[in-house]
């Protein structure tokens, strides 16, 4: 509906002026901020004499009496106006109510397929706060693409192969505990890895032994190693699945580097573009971009070798518009090399995209001083419990409800904390700070949603479903009209996110929307007012809740009904 509204505005302005629809669209900027005009036409972008044309256009539009626009004015060489919100009020609210949980969706990707690879932790390392970014950003992109009509395949490509497994297997033979492995495979394997890495720093022979173990794995020559590796992998994946469920993250495919070991070798052995370096290793020479090592002189493959094989298989299996990799900016060079090699092999480079992000401050893995994400979720949940207790909500929840609600609030706060800044920027993790200052946080958005749901529940006897019988003049109030206009913008914000996969766009919009809801809620009181006024007001509040709900879902949060 958003696009249709502005298409009509463009056509109406064009019809009344000397400018084509294409010219009007090219010079038009739109806004929902109350202190800015809804529409500004920057005529200096399309006219050699913008000031003269601005005066002429203002006079023309003033005489045209276009129903959809009002408050015409000139600002320097631009013509400004507002959308006549009274004219669209009924249609916007009716459209939101009709579409409800799919309001904000679009058909940009209809008939097209996308593949998104994200999370992709290493089996040998713990799942810490640094992994949160790829996981939740990747799920956001999947949610966004599906809301935009794309058939989307989500892939978790585990780091389940490589030299580090030589270290893990060697470490387990020395420091492993069957009891600890069963109890918490991720934490135990990480502790084993840290201990054997410390040994390697003191004794070079440990490093050589680990390399030899991995070489035997590559050649499938050691049954003990392979059986133990498979067990580590299975136990770890089951543990990850539990964590993913808590984060509202789901994958269509659980994959891993190990699945592409042989195919990677085959590409190296059969590719005509491959070159042998002076030391006997195999490389792709990308010219100015440098050489890309894909096989060492001892015959072992590398991470990028398996990435090449995985990318080719995905192209063949899914025929996607694009394969998106959600990985930190630390891996920029890796993906430049990967896409360069794929292009050299004859594949379209534009089929691949690296969506990067900045890092969470204070994370280190060398000394083992890293918090498990599982522990962080639990600590964050305790913080949220304290917030709920301080709001005197203890009596309205059972113990189980308190735990469940606090965890949803914790996850929501983690998500919004991660998504508030642009993804290319890093941030410092501080859940207690976010709990103390709730403005703009996940807690703030959930509170706004719960408040609206509570009003709906308390006024369940008020029937606003028959839009045709509602008296919309009862809510011709500036704050309400601006709020409803802002609700329509959700469609545009979702579509705009497809340009850069930037979740901060939706977070900023939802924060602003929640603020507008809080600013208008006192003049939208439902309880104890005239029946017709109650119907009109509740329709607005219900529509606002639907938009908040849908926005939270795209971000990956579970909207709460009470807190």
Swiss-Prot record:
Please provide, alphabetically and separated by semicolons, the GO molecular function terms listed in this UniProt record: arginine-tRNA ligase activity; ATP binding
Per the record, its GO cellular-component terms are:
mitochondrion
Asked if Ligase is a keyword of the record, the answer is yes
* Reactions accelerated catalytically: tRNA(Arg) + L-arginine + ATP = L-arginyl-tRNA(Arg) + AMP + diphosphate
Record key words, sorted: Aminoacyl-tRNA synthetase, ATP-binding, Ligase, Nucleotide-binding, Protein biosynthesis
Read off the InterPro entries from this record.
aa-tRNA-synth_I_CS, Arg-tRNA-ligase, ArgRS_core, DALR_anticod-bd, Rossmann-like_a/b/a_fold, tRNAsynth_Ia_anticodon-bd
Q: Which Gene Ontology BP terms does the record give?
A: arginyl-tRNA aminoacylation; mitochondrial translation
- Database matches in Pfam families: DALR_1, tRNA-synt_1d
For this chain, the family text in UniProt reads: Belongs to the class-I aminoacyl-tRNA synthetase family.
Q: What is this protein called?
A: Arginine--tRNA ligase
- Source organism per entry reads Encephalitozoon cuniculi (strain GB-M1)
